[in-house]
Amino acid sequence: MSLIRTETRDTKRAADPLHDLRSKPFSEWGEDEIRRFNLIDALLEFVYTDTSSPFGIGMTFDYTECWEIGVRDDCLVMTRVKPVHPEYAKHWNMKGVMNDKTRFHADKWVGYSKVLAWVSLSHKDTFTGAKRFQYFQTMYDMERQINANLPVGGLPNVDTERTGKLFQRDDFSEDSHANDPKLVGDDYVPQAPEQIN
């Protein structure tokens, strides 16, 4: 340990490019701050992304292509602006997801907003470990309020290039795993144990 403080604002900024944004309230953020804290930063800091499986890669495609970052009601939010990416959609029963009245899969609907943080990026750190649940509880309550008026199925969206007409696409299937080589078909009949060598 040194008695001379060697850490400066420049070294902190070099270690963390978002250092200046961490304590700045979201109410003071503008276009420049949103541009600096882009979607990739949001994914790395707030959203778990798995790139080691086809499902995880599809989820990452979906996050990078179908969501936008913005500030709403003093919260940093990610809002779905496009329907589910086809690589991600093939892992879900999309008709069931789009008609789900329980809203369990509402994050697949156009117009859904996920609250990533509230007040500022560093506000979470002002809560002690024992009280941190209050931060997340408030964050989830805000998310429910923001999405309270979102209709079942989400907002109408026309995306002729991709999934706007998901159910009319040639590659759409009710059984998204029909051609999965690791799974057997519906007509599969197992061999009797005595026939297996």
Curated annotation (Swiss-Prot):
The gene is yffP. It comes from Escherichia coli (strain K12). This is Uncharacterized protein YffP. Residues 168-197 are annotated as: Disordered. It comes from the Bacteria. Residues 168-185 have a biased composition (Basic and acidic residues).
